[in-house]
Amino acid sequence: VDVVRSITELRAILAPDAARLAARRRTEANAERLIHAAAAMAEAALDLDELSERANYFWKQLILSSGNLAYRLAFNSLQTAYLDHAPQFRKLIAPELQAASAYQGISQAVVDGDADLAKRRTQELVAVGDTIIMSAIEAYTSQQGGE
């Protein structure tokens, strides 16, 4: 439970600010990779395994596009922890993974250099999964008699 909560909390902080920085530090190469990654989300249909892999690639491109080395290191830790718990996460965050238009909206905001919009759209997308995960944690800890 602590690992899942920690992953969720870090993701909620890291992803939106990385999107903001990616928009501010936008390069043609980074923009192209991000647009491609977002488009790939729409092509994956409803296969959660494939969507999860493509989402992971999208977030990696976003983090790399931020140009922040500390964010990259944090993402690597986050990614390792996520992959260790991927089957559980996939099912919980299916609505987030299936929100292809949200990924495209984030990438477009980055391409347009709109840092505030990129941050806001990322917060909105991540909140979809975070709300589900935190509710599941709360339900689990209630069943267990607290933390």
Regions from the PLM with identified roles:
Residues V1, L10-A29, A39, E53-I93, ...:
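Hydrophobic, amphipathic alpha-helical faces that serve as interaction scaffolds
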Residues T8-E9, Y57, Y103, Q108:
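Generic hydrophobic-segment detector
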Residues I35-E43, S77-E147:
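C-terminal all-alpha effector/ligand-binding and dimerization domain
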Residues A31, L51, L117-K119:
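Solenoid-repeat scaffolds in large eukaryotic assemblies
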